[in-house]
Structure formats: structure tokens, C-alpha cells
From Swiss-Prot:
GO terms for cellular component: cytoplasm. Belongs to the HisA/HisF family. It catalyses: 1-(5-phospho-beta-D-ribosyl)-5-[(5-phospho-beta-D-ribosylamino)methylideneamino]imidazole-4-carboxamide = 5-[(5-phospho-1-deoxy-D-ribulos-1-ylimino)methylamino]-1-(5-phospho-beta-D-ribosyl)imidazole-4-carboxamide. The active site is at D8, D129. This is 1-(5-phosphoribosyl)-5-[(5-phosphoribosylamino)methylideneamino] imidazole-4-carboxamide isomerase. It comes from Trichormus variabilis (strain ATCC 29413 / PCC 7937). It comes from the Bacteria. The keyword Isomerase applies. Its EC number is 5.3.1.16. Pathway: Amino-acid biosynthesis; L-histidine biosynthesis; L-histidine from 5-phospho-alpha-D-ribose 1-diphosphate: step 4/9. It holds the Pfam family His_biosynth. It is found in: Cytoplasm. One of its GO terms (molecular function) is 1-(5-phosphoribosyl)-5-[(5-phosphoribosylamino)methylideneamino]imidazole-4-carboxamide isomerase activity.
């Protein structure tokens, strides 16, 4: 399972929000590039970046920071926040980003999503941010009447590469992932589901690993990495591609003699 560190950008700095509340942000670093390099050094194979200013403004705002990160590291990057038109998506791909995460437009302009999926096959991910099972939009400032599972099925039909599912009530809280919601979503679609929100411990990661056979292929970890509740190297050893339980046991009992 992929363990994907998150970098949330607000005014060019690396921050974490509590339940998506912009008034409850905590700055973890003034230099997002250094943070990105740290996660790469600790074994990350993919990076999740959110332009929080962009999510609010409806257009990409932290272009400079995103470009600097993309140039500084060699692992693939996915980016979301403010990607609500074709030019914004083209803009981030031109910076060297591998995946664009679309959220609000999935609800408001599904036809555009379909066109982008055709233009960039395998590179469009849908971010479904849910509050009590309903999809939130516009930087989580609005809640729609659309069910998360309903949108996931529609986006799969449009050609989306994967779904990132965030439970807003748990995001930034270290309260643990919403396993029931993830199970329900993964059962409804056949494309990969990436979990996000609430992960606080290796125990949480192992509980998500149990959902891997059902289609939950990755987990985005944010606050817990920054507070030290989760060590990235240990997380990768626990559930990553080369995890300890995937290594065949040494059955040479002579070593115990």
C-alpha cells in the first residue's frame, strides 16, 4: 500500500488545518521544499500537495512553491486545490506534476472532467471530500446534496484514474480513518481508492491495510507525520510495498541454536 505524505500550502508555507478550518491552521515549516526533500529521504515514493489558497480562490495560487518542489524532487507528485478549469490543469502539468486532483468541478462540471480524463488518461484523480456522506466543495466551504458513493461511480464512468476519499470530520484530528465509509466506497467502484483524513498511528495504517484487497491502495498521511505520531520509515515498513510481512521468513532454524 502506498503511504503518501501530504504537504498543504497556505501563503507559501507548509501548514495543517483542523477539520478543514482555515482559521485553525498550524504552520509546520516556512520552506515546503525542505519538507518535500525530507519525505523523499525517508522513503516516500509519491507526494500529495494541496494548494489551500487555491482551493479557496478557485485557481492555483501557490505556483512558485509547487514548481520549486517539482524541480527539487524526483518522485511523482499529485496536486489538488483550485483546479477548476482546463487551463489550471494544464498549468500544473506543465510544472512537472504527474496527477491533477479535481474536486469541485467533479460536482459542478462533470463533462469537463470527462474531457480532461480523455486528454490526460491515467492522470486525473478525483478528490471526494465528504461530510456525513455528502460531498463538500469549494475548499470544503460548501456541502452539496451529492452522495460520495454516487459521485465516485459517476467519475469512474468518466475515466478517472483513482478516487481520494477524505472524511472532513476526521481530517487533521488524528481521530482515525472512517473505515466503514472507505469500505462502502471501495465496494461501489473498481478503480483504486486512496484514504485521507484522521490517520494517527501505525495501528490505523494496519486497519487500512486490511481494506487493500477491496481496493484501498494508498493512504495520505498529514498531521501525524508532522507531530511525530507516525514515523514515515516505520509506516512504510508496516504497510508499504516492501513491508515486513511480505518478506518471506527465514526458516533456517540453525540461527537459533
Amino acid at each position: 500500500m502506498d503511504v503518501i505524505p501530504a504537504i498543504d500550502l497556505l501563503e507559501g508555507r507548509c501548514v495543517r488545518l483542523y477539520q478543514g478550518d482555515y482559521d485553525r491552521s498550524q504552520v509546520f515549516s516556512e520552506n515546503p521544499v525542505d519538507v518535500a526533500k525530507q519525505w523523499v529521504d525517508e522513503g516516500a515514493t509519491r507526494l500529495h500537495i494541496v494548494d489551500l489558497d487555491g482551493a479557496k480562490a478557485g485557481k492555483v495560487v501557490n505556483l512558485g512553491a509547487i514548481e520549486a518542489i517539482a524541480q527539487a524532487i524526483s518522485i511523482p507528485i499529485e496536486i489538488g486545490g483550485g483546479l477548476r478549469d482546463r487551463s489550471s490543469v494544464e498549468q500544473v502539468f506543465n510544472l512537472g506534476v504527474q496527477w491533477a486532483i479535481l474536486g469541485t468541478v467533479a460536482v459542478e462540471q462533470p463533462q469537463l472532467v470527462q474531457e480532461l480524463c480523455q486528454q490526460y488518461p491515467g492522470q486525473i484523480i478525483i478528490g471526494i471530500d465528504a461530510r456525513n456522506g455528502l460531498v463538500a466543495t469549494r475548499g470544503w466551504l460548501e456541502t452539496s446534496e451529492v452522495l460520495a458513493t454516487q459521485l465516485a461511480v459517476q467519475m469512474q464512468e468518466m475515466g478517472a484514474a483513482a478516487i481520494i476519499y477524505t472524511d472532513i470530520h476526521r481530517d487533521g484530528t488524528l481521530a482515525g480513518p472512517n473505515l466503514d465509509a472507505l469500505r462502502e466506497l471501495a465496494a461501489a467502484i473498481s478503480i483504486p481508492v486512496i484514504a485521507s483524513g484522521g490517520v494517527s498511528s501505525v495501528t490505523d495504517l494496519l486497519s487500512l491495510l486490511a481494506l487493500e484487497p477491496q481496493g484501498v491502495t494508498g493512504v495520505i498521511v498529514g498531521r501525524a507525520l508532522y507531530t511525530g505520531d507516525i514515523n514515515l520509515k516505520e509506516a512504510l515498513q508496516a504497510i508499504g510495498p516492501g513491508r515486513i510481512q511480505d518478506i518471506p521468513p527465514n526458516l533456517d532454524f540453525s540461527s537459533f541454536a
